[in-house]
Amino acid sequence: GIHGSPTAVMAFEGATGWLVGPENRGMASMFTMMNNARLAVGAQGVGLAEAAWQHAMHYAMDRKQGRTPRGPGAIIDHADVRRMLAEARAEIFAARAITLACGLAINLSHATNAPHWEARAALLTPIAKAHATDIGCEVTSLGVQVHGGMGFVEETGAAQFYRDVRITPIYEGTNGIQAMDLVGRKLSDGGESAFRLLQEIEDHAEHAHTTLPTLTGDVWEAAETLRETTEWMLAAEATDRAAGAVPYLRAFARVLGGHYHLRAAMADPSGPRARLARVFVDRILPEHETLCLRARA
């Protein structure tokens, strides 16, 4: 269970209930209250993923087992362990970047009162909460996998990260609710805020093409596929949108992850950021296509 939480059963009996906001608008009012909490839970997912990754990395560098093509050595020299650690690192970077972009949009909306930033913050909030916590669960699970059987030995601490993070896709609105919020309330502007963000992604990919031609094409094409899926969502019946909401949110997060990795790579085209971006674009970003197909199914 979750420790240190004030969650409890409360019996109000004959207490008077007061409406929150106008009649039939209570949910919208509640989401206004929850926005900061949703972003904070996303940050919790990122933090636990980072802690689990560092824990797994140290173990992989220390644990000697088996033989690699280079002879006996630590398990970090095994190809699949290296793959898990590299993909987890790329996932954490993307989830952190989405969370930071959401926080920046919230700050700018407060500082400027500009409708553009208010819309951007609203669009990114459900994505940041849902995706960062999903990635938290996936990366902490990978951390256990890197440890092998030792991951189930309590003293290693690997499983604790997973137990701690598993609540995050549930509270402050389940991730399914976040996805419903995205395809419902956040696309209710006719997709204007989503299309504006996708245009920024495509424009940046075109700008970066001369410097990083092997990365930019994939990012641009992913944004275009998501644009087409967004158009489908806007034209679909409400039940069809709801059925495709979860894969749509994840596809959106994949495209955003590719965009932020590309921006980081542009700041260091021959350094580690560019190599990490290559991992994401080659191994993780392609998921967006299947996710978009599932969203439209």
Residue locations for each model-derived region?
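Internal glycine-rich alpha/beta core junctions
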Residues: 1-225
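C-terminal amphipathic alpha-helical interaction region
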Residues: 189, 200-297
